[in-house]
Amino acid sequence: MPENLDDLAADLAAGRTDPVQLVERALERARASDAVFITLMEDAALADAHAARRRWTRGQPLSSHDGIPIAWKDLFDIAGTRTSAGSRTRDEAVPAGCDAPVVAATRRLGFIPIGKTNLSEFAFSGLGANPHFGTPTADLPGAPRMPGGSSSGSAVAVQRGIVPAAIGTDTAGSVRVPAAFTGCVGYKASQARYDMAGVFPLAGSLDSLGPLAGCVADCATMDAAMRGVSAQLLPLTPPQFVVDDSIIDDPAVTAPVRAHFEDVLARVSPYAPIRRQRVDAWHRAREAITTLGWLGAYEARHLHIDTLTGPKRSLVDARVLSRLDGAARISAEAAAELVAIRAREMQRLRAELAGATLILPTVKHTAPLLAPLEADPARFAEVNVATLALTMIASFLDMPGVALPTGSTADGRPLSTHLCAASGEDDRVLAQAVWLEQRLRS
């Protein structure tokens, strides 16, 4: 896992390292890691690093993080680069003329983008596979496993220590699932938290952004940087957690995941109140998705309809194509009903949680082996649905959430716990994730 941002900032301030060294090391590691990046911005990153070193030499850094390398999922516009969305259908896309606002905000603090990371095509899969640019894999024991998606490259770039932080997008779990599968921290924001301009969309009513890093504090630092605000010290007050036993008792939650989650609760219950209750809004949202379909699939199909019906259709990953084609069954009337249900259940959720934080496993299972799923499209589709089952509901309810690595299985598969709250309560859920992270380490 990477060094954290505060340690790197201290090293820069003390002269123990400099931006050129940091960027050169990041680029070297990136070149040695297959399929993590779609575009490496070597010349631009090194030029930025030399400029940052000159600022440090003059005693005028842009911030304490001036010169630290980061990475961006290849959905974000970065001036002079093509935004691929992980698809060969965009091989001829015109390079971006300017940075997306969130990219520009981090540049103003001196963060250096070294490249654009791999992802599931169009960001439309929870497993992270990409037949066009390869599938990145985390540095874990045993045979390669799915990295989680769709922000697969961003998670692996952090897990392999290429960069201390990378930015992803999340529509149904695309930050939190790869964080869970690779053992990183992943923060998915409420939808309205960031400026979404210059970010290639999947489903406009559900798309959100978020950083992946080695600790919650680094996610909070990147969150502030992306918004152009000063990072605030997160108060470490014990949270009140809500546990819905009917979520945990689902037979699809595997035994290792369930046992680990109960262990997490046992370790924190002496220090934080845990309220066990059925969260009706959660189950009503799940029922709506099951009955009417996934709103994100409906919106994604309409976004990509020209590709689906045009000459570039054959260039699309067959597994992504199958999901987009399947969304044709969702009618406009069903989509409108989903929008109405969503608004209603978001209000219900806020009342039910009453300022508390829902805590649950991030995913019902650990990272699956890569090879069997690559060889079996039907099984791939089945596992993809199961992988997104929990995070998708939280996304439907616009819940900000943190996927926190809280342990591992005996054979080294990461285990993750998800903290999520009512829409707009991002600062609180980040603070509570810091509290939980520190409590479990003590």
List where the protein language model places each region:
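An N-terminal boundary/leader segment
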Residues: M1-A47, T57, A266, R441-S442
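Acyltransferase
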Residues: R16-E24, H50, P256-R278, I305-P311, ...
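Immediate post-signal peptide segment of exported/extracytoplasmic ligand-binding proteins
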Residues: A52-P69, L234-F241
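Short glycine/serine-rich loop/turn segments
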Residues: H65-L206, L360-R379
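Structural helix-boundary/capping segments
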Residues: R160, P164-I248, E262, R267, ...
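Gly/Ser-rich, acidic/histidine-flanked active-site/gating loops
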Residues: A225-W294, R319, G326-R329, S408
